[in-house]
A protein has these predicted regions:
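A glycine-rich phosphate-binding loop feature that marks nucleotide/adenosyl-phosphate handling sites
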Residues: 174-177, 259-264, 305, 309-312
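A helix-coil-helix interface module used to build multimeric assemblies
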Residues: 1-182, 186-199, 265-266, 276-282
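Long, amphipathic alpha-helical stalk/connector segments used for oligomerization, subunit docking
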Residues: 287-322
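Acidic, glycine-rich loop-and-beta core segments that form the ion-binding/anion-interacting portion
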Residues: 186-289
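Short, well-ordered loop/turn and helix-capping segments at boundaries between secondary-structure elements
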Residues: 6, 10, 248, 252, ...
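Amphipathic alpha-helical coiled-coil segments and their boundaries
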Residues: 100-101, 108, 149, 221, ...
Length: 322
C-alpha cells in the first residue's frame, strides 16, 4: 500500500502531487509496525477504533490505519489516494509474493544449501568406505558409504537449483483483472507498463523474482505458488528417504551416534541413544508435505472471477515452511 502510494506520486500522468523525500519517509515509517500498531489494525477490523466502525475486512483496516497515522501530516491532502483502484488481492498477492521470496532467500535456500554441503562432504569423505548394499532388504552387491550419500546430495542439488530459479507471479490489475477503475480515471496512462514497472522495483539482487502476470481474474491463479510448493515437496521427500536410510544404518550399527552431554536416550533404558533427530525430521517433513500437497491442489482453483477460500489457506504457508 505504501510503495504503491509513493509510486503514484512519482507518475507524471496521475493526479497525485509529488511527495517530498521527507513525506516518502513518513509513509515508509509505517512499515515498522509495533505491537500497538498491529493491535490498532485488528481493532479497526473487529470492533472499530475511534470514529471508525469495524470493517470486518483486514485490508480495509490497513487502509484506515494508514490514513489515521498520516492525519495531521503534510500528506493529509493525499490520504484518499491510498488504495486507489486496488482490490485487496492486489495488495495481498504482492505481500505474499514478497514474504515467500524473502523466506526462500533468507531462510530456506541457506538451510537447504547447508544440508546439501554437509551430505556432499560425507559423500567425498567416505567415498572409499565399503558398505554392504541391500536390495529388497536383503544382502546385495557392495557399495560405498560415500556413493550412497552422493545419491542424496545429487538429488538435493537438482531440486535446489530449480528452487533457486523459481519465479513468483503476481498481479496488480484491479477488481476483476481488467483495470476498470484505472482506465476510467486515467485512460491516458499505460497501466500495463505501470504494473510491470511497479512490480519489478521489488526485484532486488538475490531475491526470488516477482513476475507481473497481466492476464488474471481478481486473483493471480497461484500456478507459480504450486510450482514452488511442489519443488519443496520433492525436496522434503528426498530428505524423508535420507532420514529413513540413516535410521537403518544406525539400527544396523554402521553409523554410531554420539550423545550430547547430559542427554538421556530413554526414561527407562539409559544405555540407548535413539535417532530422534532423524525421526522428528521425518515426521515434520511429512506434516509439511501434507500442507504443500493441499496448497497445490487447492490454490489453482477459484470459482469464476474469485472466491475467498484461498485466503484462509494462504495464512498457513508459514506452518508448512516452519
Amino acid at each position: 500500500e505504501g510503495e504503491y502510494l509513493i509510486f503514484f506520486s512519482e507518475h507524471p500522468q496521475i493526479g497525485t502531487r509529488n511527495f517530498s523525500e521527507e513525506e516518502k519517509g513518513l509513509v515508509r515509517k509505517l512499515y515498522d509496525l509495533s505491537t500497538e500498531d498491529a493491535g490498532m489494525v485488528k481493532a479497526i477490523e473487529v470492533k472499530g477504533y475511534g470514529q471508525i466502525k469495524p470493517t470486518n475486512h483486514d485490508v480495509k483496516a490497513v487502509e484506515y490505519f494508514m490514513k489515521e497515522c498520516l492525519k495531521g501530516t503534510s500528506l493529509e491532502d493525499s490520504l484518499e489516494w491510498i488504495h486507489f483502484a486496488l482490490t485487496s488481492e492486489d495488495v495481498n498477492n504482492l505481500a505474499y509474493g514478497l514474504m515467500l521470496s524473502d523466506a526462500l532467500r533468507e531462510v530456506v535456500l541457506p538451510a537447504i544449501g547447508e544440508v546439501y554441503r554437509a551430505i556432499e562432504w560425507l559423500a567425498q569423505t567416505y567415498k572409499d568406505v565399503p558398505l554392504l548394499a541391500r536390495t529388497h532388504g536383503q544382502s546385495a552387491s557392495p557399495t560405498t558409504f560415500g556413493k550412497e550419500f552422493k545419491v542424496f546430495s545429487s538429488r538435493i542439488k537438482r531440486q535446489l537449483d530449480q528452487l533457486n530459479d523459481s519465479e513468483i507471479l503476481v498481479k496488480l490489475n484491479g477488481a476483476t483483472g481488467n483495470y476498470n477503475a484505472h482506465a476510467v480515471a486515467y485512460p491516458q496512462v499505460d497501466w500495463l507498463n505501470f504494473t510491470s514497472d511497479f512490480i519489478r522495483k521489488f526485484n532486488t539482487e538475490g531475491r526470488i523474482k516477482l513476475i507481473p502476470n497481466l492476464i488474471t481474474t481478481q486473483i493471480e491463479p497461484h500456478d507459480s505458488y504450486v510450482e514452488l510448493f511442489d519443488n519443496m515437496r520433492r525436496l522434503n521427500i528426498i530428505m524423508i528417504g535420507f532420514n529413513q536410510d540413516l535410521w537403518r544404518y544406525i539400527s544396523d550399527e554402521w553409523v554410531t551416534q554420539k550423545p550430547a552431554d547430559g542427554e538421556v536416550g530413554s526414561s527407562t533404558m539409559p544405555h540407548k541413544i535413539n535417532p530422534i533427530d532423524f525421526e522428528n525430521s521425518e515426521g515434520n517433513l511429512g506434516i509439511a508435505n501434507a500442507l504443500f500437497d493441499y496448497f497445490s491442489r487447492k490454490l489453482p482453483i477459484s470459482r469464476l472471477q474469485r472466491d475467498l477460500s484461498d485466503s484462509t489457506v494462504e495464512k498457513n504457508f508459514g506452518v508448512a515452511f516452519a
